[in-house]
């Protein structure tokens, strides 16, 4: 995610794109950094992965035989050697930053060096249909708990505990939010526009969900109706159940959207209903790939078999993504791996798509 062209050229390019291009809906670019200490087994491991919308496109792993930022999507492979060199150097610099931040966190929390600890950082930008910043974010976590986060105004911080308040005071004194805001409003959006253009066929597609409802008897008195959406992209989708037109949100079991392993996603929503009253329930599906929302009912004559194989495959892929990327459950609260008490270092260039000028340093 590093810029390979001179910044002046990039700004001209992004300005041209902003004037001539529009995008359906909003789009996002996010980076997830994770550093894990392992006492007695060498330096902490550092992994960063980059996503445009729901597509992973780059990955760096400090444990690789020859650590480099590597492509994870065909459309990013067109970037030249300078891009990959710059992204690699930014990732290596962040790895060193987070290793130092792990040491600082031990002091802040009065912890022993004998245990393993984790720092996570999630940051990025959302862009609206007009090609401009919709929202920016930077959130960090330590050992799976919120640490510090940039507020929506992009100019202030929220610290989760007294240790994080030390970091907050340092960053406020150094006006770190200003640097981060400049990256989010400028470089981040510029690169997101570029990636959307280069990966147009993949990133700007909308795969229509394949939908159906299945029926699962629980007893003589109750049954589960499960509404399925399969093979859709992008991942954002809404599934809701209604009874006689009234939302059943409180009574609905809803699973997280899952990758299917082929670049699409899966999701289901279930509700327990009294036997014999199934016809009173409707499932409503909203997705970018649909010209209008769908309304589904269970049709007894077309009872479907649950696609267990597909769901199991999706879960397996999800496990690989989570474990392999070591991005754990930090997304759940949008935690990230910022430096505990760190400050942003002025790295070699602000042209990195990762934002080398917002690297958290102790």
Curated annotation (Swiss-Prot):
Residues 299-308 are annotated as: Connecting peptide. It is a single-pass type I membrane protein. It is found in: Membrane. Residues 343-362 have a biased composition (Low complexity). GO terms for cellular component: early endosome membrane; ER to Golgi transport vesicle membrane; external side of plasma membrane; extracellular space; lumenal side of endoplasmic reticulum membrane; MHC class I protein complex; phagocytic vesicle membrane; recycling endosome membrane. Glycans are attached at residue 110. Residues 333-362 are cytoplasmic. It comes from the Eukaryota. Pfam families: C1-set, MHC_I, MHC_I_C. One of its GO terms (molecular function) is peptide antigen binding. Residues 335-362 are annotated as: Disordered. The keyword Membrane applies. Residues 1-24 form the signal peptide. InterPro entries: Ig-like_dom, Ig-like_dom_sf, Ig-like_fold, Ig/MHC_CS, Ig_C1-set, MHC_class-I_related, MHC_I-like_Ag-recog, MHC_I-like_Ag-recog_sf. Disulfide bonds join 125-188, 227-283. Residues 25-308 are extracellular. Keywords: Disulfide bond, Glycoprotein, Immunity, Membrane, MHC I, Signal, Transmembrane, Transmembrane helix. The chain crosses the membrane at residues 309-332. Involved in the presentation of foreign antigens to the immune system. PANTHER family: CLASS I HISTOCOMPATIBILITY ANTIGEN, GOGO-B*0102 ALPHA CHAIN, MHC CLASS I-RELATED. Heterodimer of an alpha chain and a beta chain (beta-2-microglobulin). This is Class I histocompatibility antigen, Gogo-B*0103 alpha chain.
